[in-house]
């Protein structure tokens, strides 16, 4: 009980660090010099959470439920099994699936598995292995603690500025930095998207992409540069780049990275010629959280949930793997309870159908063509291009993919000296046997939608934390990703037309 109490206390701290910014998001006006509605009722509500008298304040029922779910991972570990023989990968995957284990990552070199510590002997007796995470609960807890070091303003200073109507763009920028120093829940992310659309309404537009099985709206942010010669008229025939994150709910790091890239493009449009060129050249659509139901579930119930939350016919299990539900190399014969389950038919998931409609209907009606597509994931630090379904298919653009990928990994490395790999997304067992990744987004958009430059981007890390990357790594990762985005856009702009 003492351990559980300490967990709840840290959740209190996390909520306190976020709540001021959430209020700001909800009440920001649509101007660069912000004025914020404020009254005693709001301040009273704020105080009931933060506790200005120094005592721990009340916390939402959702946060309490989430805190009590953390001990569910007690005595669980994450291990890496090294592949030393040609049939190791298929053997390990079959055994893991038969035991209903959570497969975190796999490639031609290793397989990462989440399992009970008591079951580790079975695996290490058969394969050379290492323990990556020896205390899953502790590592999970580290991932949610916000990084509030070097905050330029105190909470009281921020509140005073809001109350006096003196909240300017500089202070907003500083608190946006704080927004990126901890993981945010879905409500905060959606409020942040609305704020961006309000602050930069001459450059951006909020886009409802679709509705999920649980009735939530998938929100995107559309970015365009200013074109004085067009007199504000809608630009037609513009090339589009789509960047999506959060298709797998537990891969949290991709979400703030996508948000950060969108913010930087908006904030630097007037001061950076390279950014201005990219917004003038392309229409950018950022979708930070495609799997909104699943992401919400990782905050309320199970931090390591991956699929969406769509009910399945004739199954007690929930959810579809959104990156296995596309109509290229689709496989509907996977166990519905598996994280790999891609549904009974392509586009069965509301989320993939929504993105399909965006690409094939909404944009085509505006005579716009998608030329770039980035599907942002974690972990493994890799840049991958089609085809994922099979290594027997070589895209005719392989040399171009490789040229661009080399530039992308150089940019990712340049920022913080992090090494990323690059390759075709299929995973070979060896020189003869192949592994198939069915129904992936990058395969469909490349083959069926004729998108020239689709990539699957897997951000930090290499397995030390896996899906539980600490909050202190959000900003460094996001900066790497933004540098990569700039190179990606410049490459397409200069060499693809």
Curated annotation (Swiss-Prot):
User: What is this protein's record name?
Assistant: Inactive metallocarboxypeptidase ecm14
Q: Which cofactor does it need?
A: Zn(2+)
Role: Inactive carboxypeptidase that may play a role in cell wall organization and biogenesis.
Signal sequence range = 1-28
Q: Which residues bind Zn(2+)?
A: 248, 251, 377
**Which keywords belong to this entry?**
Disulfide bond, Endoplasmic reticulum, Metal-binding, Secreted, Signal, Zinc
InterPro entries reported in the protein's UniProt record: Peptidase_M14 (IPR000834)
Propeptide segments, given as residue ranges: 29-148
The root-end lineage is: Eukaryota, Fungi, Dikarya, Ascomycota, Taphrinomycotina
Has the keyword Endoplasmic reticulum been applied to this entry? yes
Q: List the disulfide bonds.
A: 317-337
């Amino acid at each position: 009980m003492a351990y559980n109490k300490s967990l709840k206390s840290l959740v209190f701290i996390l909520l306190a660090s976020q709540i001021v910014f959430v209020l700001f998001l909800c009440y920001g006006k649509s101007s660069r010099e912000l004025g914020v509605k404020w009254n005693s009722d709001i301040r009273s509500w704020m105080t009931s959470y933060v506790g200005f008298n120094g005592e721990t304040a009340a916390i939402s029922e959702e946060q309490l439920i989430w805190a009590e779910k953390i001990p569910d991972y007690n005595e669980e570990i994450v291990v890496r099994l090294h592949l030393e023989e040609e049939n190791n990968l298929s053997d390990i995957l079959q055994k893991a699936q038969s035991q209903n284990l959570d497969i975190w990552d796999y490639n031609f070199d290793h397989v990462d598995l989440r399992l009970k510590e008591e079951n580790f002997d079975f695996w290490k007796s058969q394969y050379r292995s290492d323990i990556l995470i020896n205390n899953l609960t502790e590592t999970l807890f580290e991932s949610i603690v916000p990084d509030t070091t070097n905050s330029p303003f105190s909470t009281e200073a921020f509140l005073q500025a809001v109350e006096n109507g003196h909240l300017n763009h500089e202070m907003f920028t500083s608190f946006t930095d704080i927004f990126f120093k901890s993981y945010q829940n879905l409500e905060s992310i959606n409020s942040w998207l609305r704020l961006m659309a309000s602050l930069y309404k001459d450059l951006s537009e909020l886009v409802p992409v679709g509705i999920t099985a649980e009735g939530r709206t998938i929100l995107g942010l559309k970015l365009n540069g200013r074109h004085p010669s067009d007199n504000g008229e809608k630009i037609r025939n513009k090339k589009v780049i789509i960047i999506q994150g959060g298709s797998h709910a537990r891969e949290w790091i991709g979400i703030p990275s996508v948000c950060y890239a969108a913010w930087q493009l908006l904030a630097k449009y007037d001061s950076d010629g390279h950014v201005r060129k990219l917004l003038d050249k392309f229409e950018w659509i950022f979708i930070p959280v495609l799997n909104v139901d699943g992401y919400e579930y990782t905050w309320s119930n199970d931090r390591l949930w991956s699929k969406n939350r769509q009910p399945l016919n004739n199954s007690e299990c929930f959810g579809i793997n959104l990156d296995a539900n596309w109509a290229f190399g689709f496989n509907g014969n996977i166990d519905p309870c598996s994280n790999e389950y891609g549904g009974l038919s392509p586009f069965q998931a509301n989320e993939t159908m929504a993105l399909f409609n965006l690409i094939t209907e909404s944009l085509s009606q505006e005579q716009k063509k998608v030329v770039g597509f980035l599907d942002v994931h974690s972990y493994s630090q890799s840049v991958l291009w089609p085809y994922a379904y099979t290594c027997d298919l070589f895209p005719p653009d392989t040399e171009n993919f490789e040229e661009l990928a080399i530039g992308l990994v150089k940019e990712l490395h340049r920022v913080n000296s992090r090494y990323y790999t690059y390759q075709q997304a299929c995973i070979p067992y060896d020189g003869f046997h192949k592994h198939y990744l069915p129904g992936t987004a990058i395969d469909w958009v490349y083959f069926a939608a004729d998108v020239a430059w689709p990539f699957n981007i897997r951000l930090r890390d290499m397995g030390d934390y896996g899906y539980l990357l600490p909050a202190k790594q959000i900003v460094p990762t996001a900066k790497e990703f933004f540098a990569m985005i700039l190179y990606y856009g410049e490459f397409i702009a200069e060499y693809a037309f």
